[in-house]
């Protein structure tokens, strides 16, 4: 249910969601195909974290020579040693395509247990992992052919999918910390090889490309990340995150322009914070209502409580929070309708058995739906009870 007063968005594709529940607060062409450019690196980082530990040391290979001259680069050199965490910084802060290749190679070789794998094979293995990860996260219109997002006609995504990836990304403490950083200055290997004259390491000074995070006229006070992108084909792109009070939001803009990607992202986030409220419709284990029984052991009473197993949290327009209506629908396998129209639940029942669906609506529009469960064991009735 969308609140009024949505901002004007000139980007071709956009989405605003709650970071924790995935509730969509605004959308524009959210499932249409776009080219993601360097925003790709969100899912690249997710795949890396599935296989590598942040403190692992990796060694830079010839994969850094496989990026185009006009790519954004972190500045790695052949045989350099650095931690996975700092390679991720190189990927996410200066948006290094060289970092993407280094991480893809290390991940693929570990996944396949083959340290001698060529980079061509590494890229094929890694992009297969990216596509599997996208499917696992519920993507509907994504396909990846490289780890960095440099344009390829067969490398695409959509705002909806990227929001799913961003939600998973922000759940990872290491990644969430990295993309909140305005800059990074330090040794790529965290000084671990200071006493080894043979080891190659580098000191870096990287500055985030995300103007919502850094100190400038477009800085957004509540911004916490995430990733920028640009190619001629993709336009100016930004997937942003922000936190204010008890709300955490993610905005996604594709095929936009500068400086509109900064101002429109801020406007979208403000729209979410100012016009929606976080509402817990019910707590985990809470009883919804008592429903009448039939064909049951009357010694156990004539009703059974309907309960939720999980909390139901959503975001609603602030002016509609008090207009929520609830409807309980008993599942057909348990439903008995009496002659007077009364709906009852037939025994036997096992505690925790799903027996109903609860639908929440505002002005007839569905805003949430949850399964409901029997809150007690109920025996079948006999001639003795």
Language-model segments: which ranges?
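Domain-terminus/edge residues, biased toward the C-terminal soluble/receptor-binding domains
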Residues: 140, 154-156, 160-161, 166-385
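Active-site-adjacent loops and short helices of periplasmic peptidoglycan-processing enzymes
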Residues: 1-160, 164, 169-173
């Amino acid at each position: 249910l969308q609140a009024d007063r949505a901002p004007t968005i000139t980007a071709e594709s956009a989405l605003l969601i709650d970071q924790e529940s995935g509730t969509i607060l605004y959308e524009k062409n959210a499932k249409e195909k776009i080219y993601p450019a360097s925003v790709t690196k969100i899912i690249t980082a997710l795949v890396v974290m599935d296989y590598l530990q942040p403190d692992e040391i990796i060694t830079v290979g010839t994969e850094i020579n496989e990026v185009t001259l006009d790519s954004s680069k972190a500045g790695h050199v052949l045989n350099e040693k650095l931690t996975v965490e700092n390679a991720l910084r190189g990927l996410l802060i200066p948006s290094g395509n060289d970092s993407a290749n280094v991480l893809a190679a290390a991940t693929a070789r570990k996944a396949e247990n083959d340290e001698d794998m060529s980079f061509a094979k590494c890229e094929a293995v890694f992009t297969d992992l990216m596509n599997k990860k996208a499917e696992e996260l519920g993507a509907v219109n994504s396909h990846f052919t490289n780890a960095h997002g440099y344009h390829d006609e067969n490398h695409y995504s959509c705002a909806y999918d990227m929001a799913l990836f961003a939600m998973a990304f922000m759940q990872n403490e290491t990644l969430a910390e990295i993309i909140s950083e305005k800059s990074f200055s330090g040794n790529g290997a965290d000084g671990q090889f200071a006493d080894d004259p043979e080891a190659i390491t580098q000191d870096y000074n990287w500055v985030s490309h995300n103007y919502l995070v850094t100190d400038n006229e477009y800085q957004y006070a509540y911004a916490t990340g995430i990733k920028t992108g640009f190619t001629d084909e993709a336009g100016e792109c930004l997937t942003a995150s922000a936190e204010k009070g008890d709300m955490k939001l993610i905005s996604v803009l594709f095929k936009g322009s500068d400086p509109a990607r900064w101002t429109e992202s801020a406007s979208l986030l403000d729209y979410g914070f100012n016009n929606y409220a976080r509402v817990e419709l019910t707590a985990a284990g809470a009883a919804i209502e008592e429903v009448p029984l039939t064909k049951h052991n009357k010694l156990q009473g004539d009703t059974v409580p309907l309960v939720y197993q999980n909390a139901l949290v959503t975001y609603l327009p602030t002016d509609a929070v008090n207009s929520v209506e609830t409807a309980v629908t008993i599942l057909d396998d348990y439903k008995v309708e009496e002659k007077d129209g009364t709906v009852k639940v037939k025994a036997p029942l096992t505690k925790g058995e799903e027996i109903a669906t609860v639908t929440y609506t505002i002005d007839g529009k569905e805003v949430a739906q949850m399964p409901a469960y029997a809150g007690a064991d109920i025996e079948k009735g006999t001639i003795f009870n």
